[in-house]
C-alpha cells in the first residue's frame, strides 16, 4: 500500500510528536492513500507555518503484515462508532483501548464543521450521520505507536 503525508518538510523518519491540539484519531503520525488530500494538506500547512516548502512524503507499508502484527482499529464507514471515536478524540476525552494503527474516514474542514455542530448539541447523532452520508470522505491511516512506525517505509518525496 502506498501512503502519503503532506507537510512543509521532508519526513524520512516519522516520529510520534505530542501536539497541542486534538485530532480525529488522537495522537499519531497521519497518512492517507489519497495523494490529492496529502498535497492539499502540504500546501495548507506550509501556508499556515510560513516556512519550508509544500512536500508530499511518500511511504509504503505491507498492509497484510502490519494489520496482522499490530493492533488495528478500522472504521469502514463514518458510522456511529466512528463518530463517537472522533468526537471523543477531538474533545480530548477518549479513554478507550489504545491501538497501534487506526484506519477510517478523515474529518476534513467541511466534515469537522458538522462534527462540531454535533459536539455542541446543535445536531443529534442521527442528523450528524445523515449529513455525513452526503459528504465525500477521504481516508486516513494513523500510526499511533512506535511499534507501528516500524512497518512504514519512506519511498521518497515530491515538492508540490
Enumerate the language-model features and the residues they cover.
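Conserved NAD+-utilizing ADP-ribose enzyme module
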Residues: 23-24, 40, 44-160
Amino acid at each position: 500500500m502506498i501512503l502519503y503525508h503532506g507537510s512543509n518538510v521532508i519526513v524520512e523518519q516519522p516520529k510520534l510528536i505530542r501536539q497541542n491540539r486534538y485530532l480525529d484519531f488522537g495522537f499519531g503520525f497521519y497518512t492517507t492513500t489519497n495523494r490529492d488530500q496529502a498535497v492539499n494538506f502540504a500546501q495548507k500547512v506550509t501556508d499556515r507555518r510560513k516556512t519550508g516548502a509544500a512536500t508530499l512524503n511518500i511511504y509504503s507499508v505491507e498492509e497484510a503484515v502490519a494489520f496482522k502484527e499490530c493492533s488495528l482499529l478500522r472504521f469502514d464507514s463514518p458510522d456511529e462508532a466512528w463518530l463517537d471515536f472522533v468526537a471523543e478524540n477531538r474533545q480530548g476525552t477518549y479513554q478507550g483501548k489504545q491501538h497501534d494503527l487506526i484506519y477510517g474516514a478523515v474529518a476534513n474542514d467541511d466534515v469537522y464543521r458538522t462534527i462540531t455542530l454535533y459536539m455542541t448539541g446543535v445536531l443529534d447523532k442521527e442528523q450528524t450521520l445523515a449529513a455525513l452520508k452526503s459528504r465525500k470522505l477521504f481516508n486516513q491511516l494513523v500510526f499511533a505507536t512506535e511499534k507501528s512506525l516500524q512497518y512504514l517505509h519512506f519511498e521518497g518525496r515530491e515538492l508540490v
